[in-house]
Amino acid sequence: MAETPVTRRTTPRRTTLLGLTLLVIVLVGGVAVWTTTCPCNQTPGFMLLGDVQTTPVTDWSFVNDVPLCQIQVTAFGLPHSVNLNCMATPDGQLFLSCSGCERKFWGRHVKDNEQGRLRLNGRVYPVIFHRVTNEAVLDRAWAARVKKLQVYGGGPYNPVPSPDAKRPKEWSTFKLRSAI
């Protein structure tokens, strides 16, 4: 007696389950890549990973040796990270550049004396944010920014300013200090 071959039929339910499974795998993979590699250019990231430093930093001059910093703040209870200009003054104080800060998601969610994280070259530094309102301190931070951008500026989002550029009124800054 000859056996008749059994043919499997793909049901719509099976196809839907397979499609949903593949979608979940792609989404989980995408989130995994995003959380470990971003912030990227203008795309914000999640948690900053890296070698967390446990020694307090008092002289931040080394930030002037990297084009951009990555910061992590907390918004709605979740980590949110971005790339931005950071600069140190000649006396080693650390500042973040924030043009039009009130329009930026991260800038609206940083409270005074809030803890966050700063990542440079794979090292993560726990920091405390302080919004600067003193005009003299704003001018010192602006001068440090202009000086640093003479070396690292020039990209589409980070043009090189004139060496004697005046600080725009909508520009603000945060002073960071070590949280350790």
Regions found by a protein language model. Give the residues of each.
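General helical structural elements
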Residues: 12-13, 17-18, 149
